[in-house]
C-alpha cells in the first residue's frame, strides 16, 4: 500500500529511492518533478541528496532545495540520505538540515551515507519507519 503522504525524493538514484519507497509504502518522486502542491500534500519526506564529484550539489537538488525552502515546512518530517557523495559534504548536508528546521521541519534521523562501507540501508529504514 502506497502512502501519498510519504515521498522519497531522488535525483538519479532511482534504485535506492525505489527500495526505500517499497519498504515504507511510500512514493518515489524525482526532485525534478517536485512542486509546491507535492510539498503541501505530503507529510513526510525522505531526501536522497546527491553531490557532483567536485562536492557541489547537483543542479536538480539546488532547484529542489530552493523549492522546499520557499515553503512553510511546519509539521513536515524529513529524513536525509546521501546517495552520491561522502562525509566530505557533511557540513553542507548539516547546513541543509538546519535550513529545513528553520522553515519548521523536523529531522528524524542521522544522515545515511549510502556509499559508506559502514552504512546499512535496512537498519536506517527500520530506524526511521516508526517516526515517518
What is each PLM-predicted segment?
Residues 2-132:
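FMN-binding flavodoxin-like domain, especially the glycine-rich phosphate-binding loop
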Amino acid at each position: 500500500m502506497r502512502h501519498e503522504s510519504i515521498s522519497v525524493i531522488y535525483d538519479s538514484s532511482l534504485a535506492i529511492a525505489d527500495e526505500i519507497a517499497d519498504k515504507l509504502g511510500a512514493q518515489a518522486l524525482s526532485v525534478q518533478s517536485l512542486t509546491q502542491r507535492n510539498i503541501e500534500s505530503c507529510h513526510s519526506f525522505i531526501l536522497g541528496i546527491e553531490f557532483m564529484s567536485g562536492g557541489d550539489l547537483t543542479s536538480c537538488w539546488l532547484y529542489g532545495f530552493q523549492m522546499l525552502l520557499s515553503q512553510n515546512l511546519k509539521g513536515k518530517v524529513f529524513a536525509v540520505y546521501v546517495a552520491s557523495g561522502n562525509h566530505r559534504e557533511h557540513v553542507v548536508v548539516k547546513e541543509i538540515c538546519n535550513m529545513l528546521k528553520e522553515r519548521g521541519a523536523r529531522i528524524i534521523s542521522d544522515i545515511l551515507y549510502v556509499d559508506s562501507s559502514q552504512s546499512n540501508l535496512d537498519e536506517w529504514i527500520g530506524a526511521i519507519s516508526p517516526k515517518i
